[in-house]
Amino acid sequence: MHSVSPSTYPSGGTSPAPADTPGTEYSEYEFSNDVAVVGMACRVAGGNHNPELLWQSLLSQKSAVGEIPEMRWEPYYRRDPRNAKELKKTTSRGYFLDRLEDFDCQFFGISPKEAEQMDPQQRVSLEVASEALEDAGIPAKSLSGSDTAVFWGVNSDDYSKLVLEDLPNVEAWMGIGTAYCGVPNRISYHLNLMGPSTAVDAACASSLVAVHHGVQAIRLGESQVAIVGGVNALCGPGLTRVLDKAGAISSDGSCKSFDDDAHGYARGEGAGALVLKSLHRALLDHDNVLAVIKGSAVAQDGKTNGIMAPNAKAQQLAARTALNVAGVDPSTVRYVEAHATSTPLGDPTEISAIAGVYGTNRPADDPCYIGSIKPNIGHLEAGAGVMGFIKAILTIQKGVLPPQANLTNLNSRIDWKTAGVKVVQEATPWPSSDPIRRAGVCSYGYGGTVSHAVIEEFNPILRPDPLDDGAATGPGLLLLSGPQEKRLALQAKTLREWMTADGKDNNLSEILTTLATRRDHHDYRAALVVDDHLDATQVLQALANGTDHSFTTQSRVLGADVSKDVVWVFSGHGAQWPDMGKQLIHNPVFFAAIQPLDELIQAEIGLSPIELLRTGDFESSDRVQILTYLMQIGLSAILQSNGITPQAVIGHSVGEIAASVVAGALTSAEGALIVTRRALLYRQVMGKGGMILVNLPSAETEEILGRRQDLVVAIDSSPSSCVVAGDKDIVAETAEAFKARGVKTFTVKSDIAFHSPTLNVLMDPLRDALGQALAPTVHIKLYSTALVDPRGQDVRDLEYWTGNMVNRVRLTSAIQAAVEDGYRLFLEVSTHPVVSHSINETLMDAGLEDFAVIPTLLRKKPTEKHILHSIAQLHCRGAEVNWAAQMPGRWATGLPTTTWMHKPIWRKIETAPLHTGLTHDVEKHTLLGQRIPVPGTDTFVYTSRLDNETKPFPGSHPLHGTEIVPAAGLINTFLKGTGGQMLQNVVLRVPVAINAPRSVQVVVQQDQVKVVSRLISSDPSLSDDDASWVTHTTAYWDRKVLGSADRIDLAAVKARLTTKLADNFSIDYLDKVGVSAMGFPWAVTEHYRDTKQMLARVDVNPAVLGDDPLPWDSSSWAPVLDAATSVGSTVFQTAALRMPAQIERVEIFTSEDPPKISYLFVEEASDSVPTSHVSVLSETGEVLAKFTAMRFSEIEGTPGVSGSMESLVHQIAWPPATPAEEPLLITKVILVSPDATARAQYAATLPTQVQSFQFSTTEDFFSNASSLPLEKGTVVAYIPGEVASLAEVPAASESFTWNLLELIKFIVNGSLPIKVFTLTSSVGDGQTPTALAQSPLIGLARIIASEHPDLGSLIDIEEPKIPLSTMRYIQGADVIRISDGIARVSRFRSLPRTKLRPASEGPRLLPRPDGTYLITGGLGILGLEVADFLVEKGARRLLLISRRALPPRRTWDQVSEDLQPTIAKIRLLESRGASVHVLPLDITKPDAVEQLSTALDRLSLPAVQGVVHAAGVLDNEMVLQTTRDAFNRVLAPKIAGALALHEVFPPKSVDFFVMFSSCGNLVGFTGQASYGSGNAFLDTLATHRARLGDSGAVAFQWTAWRGLGMGSSTDFINAELEAKGITDVTRDEAFAAWQHLAKYDIDHGVVLRSLAIDDGEPVPVPILNDIVVRRVSELSGSAQAAAGSSGNDAVPSSGPELKAYLDEKIRGCVAKVLQMTAEDVDSKAALADLGVDSVMTVTLRRQLQQTLKIPVPPTLTWSHPTVSHLVVWFAEKIGK
């Protein structure tokens, strides 16, 4: 790192190279041809994300070769099974970026949806180009609208092929998103550049050709700046396969340039970028010149032996042309970066060419050195040239020739002895004999392009002597910014780390200058006032931690539509304080501004005002006036010298004099005379007047005062206040009078009645004293507070200033005028804010929300720092600051560039395999694919492929979390496939699931028809033939044509069915029994029933699902049939989850298309099996279709239990508790706590009428119990202690829980009529070690309440005081949490939609193939099931931790019977491609952390990316029977094991940290005191980790798993579950819940289902109250009304509530369109900046209409470009 000094260099002229510099005589050369490289950046394999890291890799000869990430080729495995064979033969090794898919789309205002359609080459190029500009010290925004050029090498279209060949999912923006031109064009678009923007495809020479184009653009004057580079990304195997076949790829996947073993190259990926300027311009702009490009050339090698064969003569020609352009003698070039692709033909050819140019006539001891970067980072093809260029620059800069990597034996086909060139084989200092370091760079394309460039080091004599600013003196401003607020802390963290490491010795002022003048200032800003280097790191740390700091400002700039111009407001009397000028008079700018006025004023008053500032002697009003003016003049000078300029000014009272000076209406000397001579006259009236501030508007105050002249409104301060002035006695009386009216008044510290008729006597003397005409020109807008019209242009002459003394100060009018003119930023220029409050009031009264009022100084605060703080506040609100004026010195290079906030973005390809034939037409709602006759028979088969993308129904039809084809779809398939009108004996055997791709056949053989399928394997090693065919549904069909059927009298049926149901009865019924969604869109619009029959009017219009009409084949009977089978299942009196199992007969009586509106007549016909008949009727009653004897089977599960995920997975919410009508009597409180201070503190909060007793231990309490009043009205408050560290948690938890158990036992065994209240401290927040230590008490309290109801509660408090009111009024709750002063109780509720993760981010709790996944309890039943699930989801490496070890593998075939299932399971996992490691370790032991860490190192597995803590011990005992040892035997392992894992894998170190907890303590399972306590600890630990930023920390609070684990279902467990009103879950349901919770950012998930109860029946446990299903046979009128209005949010009518409601809804719509979270949508950001393009605008408009039910014009977002604007528009519409 170094600093760059400002310099000047004469325009034009020749290069002043020293006479003894060789090379300049090679040809005539003009200095104006020199092109400077002023910035560079790169991102390549091996974690080399910047040039400095790359340099270290070069020096250490690192080779970044590795295997291709598994995700890259995965779509090709799925697309066609034949690919697997080819991919196995394709080279999979190369040089790959760690996470090519990562992109910071928010930084660039690109939505995740659009980013997914962009080639990763565009994404990485955007980021690298931005980094290069930052490295150059060029703010990107400064280039907006400029002629800056972008030339970029690109020639890989892998991603384009990947996404565009997925035809069903092609989208509009994929064209530009995957085009070559999109790479440079995207950079130009983002930066708003107007210069050339061109993609260069010259194969492997592309990026060096791009550099050449950039050089040419600058030399020809097309562009002042050029951004050039190249990129390569390997997203598919196609080209690699081509190169394999051509023999160009190295078999071992590595480059070996110049080596005898070189037999092909290895492909690499990444990007590099350079920023170019003319050298002359770079010097004028004080840029850091990294290197100088002297010359470059591009040519073609003509017709060679083959188009891909190299040509040495052409390579030499290109090099000589570049040298000639450069005016450089080749003998002066010390190093050449060779192309060197490691091919047997290419390397010798290239070396001969280099030797022919650079090696000729060179002495053996003075060779030209050569090297190649490719063995380090691979061959980047289109990006290769620029990376070689970057290496050459680094070599010149560092003065070291880095050694060649992967070099063992020099290529024997090259004559090295006579070549005159030498490969660098060890790090070699650049020869000191070279007067200037020069290098050449070669790059060639396999199509024949040859390119060459010549560069040299920057000659420092071109720059004048550097200016040495020296160490920073005094405080300075450190600026950070980002497009989103969350970036500020990250940027602060990155900068602090750099300043304490690489940048620890750098000049602070240079760092500040760089951040202020050489970096962009985004909308979210932070400005830190710092004293020195150490202070800067500390303040940065505070910002990174989210800690407030007194001199740190952080805010968003004012909205895009709001003016950022600043109004300076100069306040009047009242801001003074004794030391206000003592520091400032040492400021040279301040002193220079006031010093000329000192002599003038001293001549008038006989005293030096500067001396008065030194002494702080200005108690009298006349001195205050003079010094107020002087301070304001000095402060104005300081502000202006710091780059702050007012666009308008306002003066308040005496402040109007300084305001006029700044505006140009007065000179500072004239202002000094006015204020001084006026102050001298004030001596005549000092001590006679008084002033008070009145909390009433001026008009109302005037009305009260009447027409009095001795008492007037002197100052109109704000819309709600004014100042009254007059005789001091009258003012005092008036204050009392106002007080009597209930009006607040405040005395103003003044003994003069300013701005009142009292001063009329001074007007003539003032005219005489001033005695001269003043008629200046105003050059800054000046609002008057002395005139009725604040915009009045009255000349500031003698009359004006005379009137100013006595006229009312109309501050409110002046501020209102400024607001009307668009101003929103106000700076009070004073020594303490006097009018800021009034300005704020006025702005708020105007209905403004986006504004700022900023003080310049604060009383008794450091003046220099506070002035900077005010500038910081202005900057952070968007004011223009001339930072160059404030920081004109040197700037520093090497500061960290933008810290990206990456998210993985990769287009998921769902295209069906090519081998499956034609796919069925989903719009016809059948499974009929390609029709294939069977030769020689009348049999034919329809073949197709079924998966989630080809499901033949538009909605969703899940059963226990698995999507299945509805029965209606299968019946429709049979009808369409046979062409018949009648089906008989339809048997629905096995549901057709679509959770995995499957081949489907519909077989029609004579009069039989069936649907069969088999799974398509995702394992490349398995053939589809290995899967078995499954028969799903069978039927017989009849060819006869049915005639018309009977007609049913609808009116008679309606009259007979007297009970009218709610329209949504069937949907609600189905949802409650587990059918959470419908496969087809239909809605019931009328519904009637009696005990055995139903009549329902059904609408099957596809628009039911939304505004977009679905693709719909009008001949499909499936939607009507779906309504029939669904409504037909709801006729039965008992609720259960039922599916059609058999239908005796299906008949269609019409050849016309099914109706959109029909009636369903349902008759129950049950015998031993639930059965119904369903007729489909026209609106006139004609029978169109009929289901006869549709028999239903009850699905495994519990009647009355909803099957949807929403009914399975819950959060714990904390709604306010309902107070009891009769309070609990509490007269005495016994405090038990080991903390004496806490006892005293809590006792002090009790009212005097409540007696208290204090004990330090339970034993102390028990021993004194006989002397205590243990009677009704007495309660025990148990207050556990606090802990300071995690190390103390296990012991403390054990102590706290056992103390509580002892208290309970004592009270129960003694039959004492007292209650126990346990008071924990903010356990719910989970932030502190104390919270963790106390958390087991939560679980214990719930179990105690279950076993001993009404014995008291646990109350989690937020303040250290006895919550007496809560103890008295909140009764019957086991655990109470006090939050925001409100007592709350726990309830299960649906997962909050606000926590739903954006679809683009994907789920968070699932594995990836490159990680290791650790499971404790790994050999247990649940542990192995978790392992199976993780492998199913892609995990390839498992580490199973268990207390027991497995025998050696060689003995596995002879293990005991009890181990055989475990061994078999592990072998099954391994057969599916997983590597399974078993680690015998007791995770609860004290040395577990050390043992686990050692084992992980020893195993050398890939990093652990996920942890599942599934270990545990269960030992049920009732509270009264448990012993301390037994209790601790369960609790200690839970806590110790979890803490051990927490220490080894701290927050954010793994993708997920899952802990298996239990719902037992939540619903109060008896006997689980210890188990429940331990699980409550796990729950809080998850919260603790989440508070530390770990988004993958989750505690699953499971119900029992059916047949599995410690809580597996048994008769006892089932009885306990039923008693608590819940059910168990199956293994599949459990993991479906896991995947559902993975979609949410939440630290816990309660997994259980509630049993249905009859309406009016009490809930088994209160926590279930909000999720329990209540059975209702029919709805009352009120219930129907409620049902009719359900689903609509209560919309506030007006005011802030409406705006908040609209803001939430509109941000939600925008987030849905952009596929991001609503929290990430900035209401004040332009929608276009967020990524909403013209296509998305259409979708957004539709979303807004659907959500807010208001027609939206197509042009709305044109005139309302932000969410805030849209809120205003919709608010107006709703208001009307």
Swiss-Prot record:
One of its GO terms (biological process) is fatty acid biosynthetic process. GO terms for molecular function: 3-oxoacyl-[acyl-carrier-protein] synthase activity; 6-methylsalicylic acid synthase activity; fatty acid synthase activity; phosphopantetheine binding; polyketide synthase activity. The modification O-(pantetheine 4'-phosphoryl)serine is found at S1734. Pfam families: Acyl_transf_1, KAsynt_C_assoc, ketoacyl-synt, Ketoacyl-synt_C, KR, PKS_DH_N, PP-binding. SMART domains: PKS_AT (SM00827), PKS_DH (SM00826), PKS_KR (SM00822), PKS_KS (SM00825), PKS_PP (SM00823), PKS_PP_betabranch (SM01294). Residues 925-1201 form the PKS/mFAS DH domain. Patulin was originally used as an antibiotic and specifically trialed to be used against the common cold, but it is no longer used for that purpose since it has been shown to induce immunological, neurological and gastrointestinal effects. Genotoxic effects of patulin with dose-dependent increase in DNA strand breaks in brain, liver and kidneys have been detected in mice. However, more recently, it has been proposed that patulin might also have anti-tumor properties. Induction: Expression is correlated with the production of patulin. Expression is positively regulated by the secondary metabolism regulator laeA. Expression is strongly decreased with increased sucrose concentrations. This decrease is lost in the presence of malic acid. Expression is increased with pH changes from 2.5 to 3.5 in the presence of a limiting concentration of sucrose, 50 mM. Natural phenols present in apple fruits such as chlorogenic acid or the flavonoid epicatechin modulate patulin biosynthesis. It comes from the Eukaryota. Residues 1-26 are annotated as: Disordered. Residues 1058-1201 are annotated as: C-terminal hotdog fold. This is 6-methylsalicylic acid synthase. The gene is patK.
